[in-house]
Curated annotation (Swiss-Prot):
Plays a role in virus cell tropism, and may be required for efficient virus replication in macrophages. It comes from African swine fever virus (isolate Tick/South Africa/Pretoriuskop Pr4/1996) (ASFV). This is Protein MGF 360-18R. Belongs to the asfivirus MGF 360 family. InterPro entries: ASFV_MGF360 (IPR002595). Pfam families: ASFV_360. GO terms for biological process: taxis.
Length: 364
């Protein structure tokens, strides 16, 4: 038979999922479902993970991150509640700052101390949630947290994630706190979290061109368009195209946008070969790139048989329907060049040729 304590926890959980009239907010206050002057609400995200919402975190936080915040605030009632709802009590040690709160967390089952593996696991879990509230709070709680500063494996993970993006600063010359800040800022752009993007943009204007670099690299054309037209950009269009072509295979919208602005499409073709970006290569050919000899030389230098096969085909031609558009509207470009839907005319031609002539077709 369930204990009265577990029934009370369940009742609060059910109550937090309901739409409650402001006339009945006193019930939520009485039940302890109140945080930062507003009701606590529970919901699930697209991955069926429980999310905590309140006035300060309208888009939602993971249970673990919400626990870290109430531990920082030394809010013992909510520490107990969020733990009862399933938050990992060990994550409390990331933000604990008073001995009485540390003792409570131990009473609730926390370890005596966290090892490197525990800390890494906490960090990995924080990166799964794609809301502005979550990404901003991750930055505020973790970027300058001493617990994360001396974990060599974490430093290596963040370093590698930023390595290709560090085109206008020396990665070895910045602090790990700045690396983490750039990491969260980049995630906001990757997931197109507009509130978080504005937060980082206003707070870290000295991160020169970082928003532009991430928009290009992560195919966020809407944000790229906004920042490119918002301020003077001191990066030439071919540098922008290099980022669009080299970081991720499928950056069709940002490649097209840079092309319309005047970037060298042949150089983009070479960059796509160097970085083994097949989809990007075919889009460059669709847009009129014809640097086939130089591209073949690069493919041979890399012993890249897939690209050698692709570049050996001789019947490619520009896609006149694509070239005739010359548009810069982000919504229209994204609709036309959606990564999941766009079919390159030249890729289709190569696939048909390859299936006819090869006993082992190239898998694209």
């Amino acid at each position: 038979m369930p204990s009265p304590h577990s029934l009370q926890t369940l009742a609060k959980k059910i109550l937090a999922t309901q739409q409650i009239s402001t006339d009945h907010y006193f019930i939520l206050k009485y039940c302890g479902l109140w945080w930062h002057g507003a009701p606590i609400m529970l919901s699930t995200n697209e991955d069926n993970q429980l999310m905590i919402k309140s006035a300060s975190f309208k888009e939602g936080l993971s249970l673990d991150l919400a626990l870290m915040k109430v531990v920082q605030e030394n809010n013992h009632d909510l520490i107990k509640l969020f733990t009862e709802w399933g938050a990992d009590i060990n994550s409390s040690f990331v933000t604990v700052n008073m001995e009485c709160t540390r003792n409570l967390c131990r009473e609730l089952g926390a370890k005596e101390a966290l090892n490197e593996r525990d800390i890494l696991q906490i960090f990995y879990k924080t990166r799964d949630i794609k809301t502005s509230s979550h990404v901003i709070l991750c930055h505020e709680l973790l970027s300058n947290n001493p617990l994360f500063q001396n974990i060599e494996r974490m430093r290596s993970i963040i370093y590698r994630s930023l390595e290709k993006l560090s085109i206008n600063f020396i990665l070895d010359d910045i602090s790990f706190s700045e690396m983490l800040t750039r990491h969260w800022y980049g995630l906001a752009i990757l997931y197109n979290l507009t509130e978080a993007i504005q937060y980082f943009y206003e707070k870290y204007k000295h991160f020169k061109n970082w928003r532009l670099i991430c928009g290009l690299s992560f195919n966020n054309l809407s944000d790229l368009y906004e920042i490119y037209n918002l301020e003077k950009v001191d990066m030439n269009i071919d540098e922008m195209m290099y980022l669009a072509c080299s970081i991720y295979d499928g950056n069709y919208s940002t490649i097209y946008y840079c092309f319309v602005l005047g970037a060298d499409i042949n150089q983009a073709m070479l960059t796509s070969v160097i970085n083994h970006c097949i989809g990007n290569l075919f889009l460059c050919i669709d847009l009129g790139a014809d640097a086939f000899e130089d591209s073949m030389e690069l493919a041979k230098q890399k012993n890249d048989n897939i690209f050698i096969s692709i570049l050996s085909f001789k019947n490619y031609s520009p896609d006149s329907s694509l070239l005739s558009l010359k548009m810069t509207d982000p919504e229209k470009i994204n609709a036309l060049l959606d990564e999941e839907k766009y079919e390159s005319k030249n890729m289709l031609m190569f696939d048909a040729h390859d299936e006819k002539t090869s006993t082992s077709p190239v898998r694209l």
